[in-house]
Amino acid sequence: MLNELEIINEAKNQTGLENFGNPLFVEGFKTLINSINKEADLNEVGVEAQKHRLIGILANILRIESAFIENPEILNEEIKSPVVIVGLPRTGSTMTHRLLASDPNHTAMLWWEGRYPAMLENEQRGNPVDRMEMGKAEVEAVMQASPDALTIHPWDYKGADEEILLLEHTFFLSLIHI
């Protein structure tokens, strides 16, 4: 079973950080842990995978909050002329997203950036090699565990991907991949 306090403490230990910032995520985090423990019927491997994922999400939240505290000017960044793609699952929205992202005049969030949005503790700005490798390993693990996953989503750690990777850090999603 997943233990809320154990997951929180492990995220703090991994990062050396304590401040999660806005506690708005806590209720959703607790609800998800309760749901996984009572409803998901996971085997030991599944429980460990979810524990690892949740520790990673909380570690990202800690790192992001730290980045905001250390660099408050981040909040003044302006996103000019955003392009927003809205679509239901399995309608081609990911491929549309990737087509638009292929234009060098556009910028898109890559899979590894969405999964690991915050710099790691020893990372040099502009050199996210470790986060890229973590993303690559995670996508490879998904492909090994479920090769058919490619039939429903074009998995590519260096490919443009959806905001769901960022939204999972809020614990406000109506969909969680387990």
Per-range role (PLM):
Residues 176-178:
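Conserved small/polar residues in nucleotide/adenosyl-binding loops
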Residues 85-101:
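Glycine-rich phosphate-binding P-loop
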Residues 45-88:
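Long amphipathic N-terminal alpha/beta scaffold segment
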Residues 159, 171-174:
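Eukaryotic endomembrane system proteins
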Residues 103-111:
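Post-Walker A helix-loop "phosphate-sensing" segment adjacent to the P-loop in P-loop NTPases
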Residues 117-165:
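P-loop NTPase motor core
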Residues 1-52, 56, 64:
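Long, basic/Gly/Ser/Thr-rich N-terminal segments
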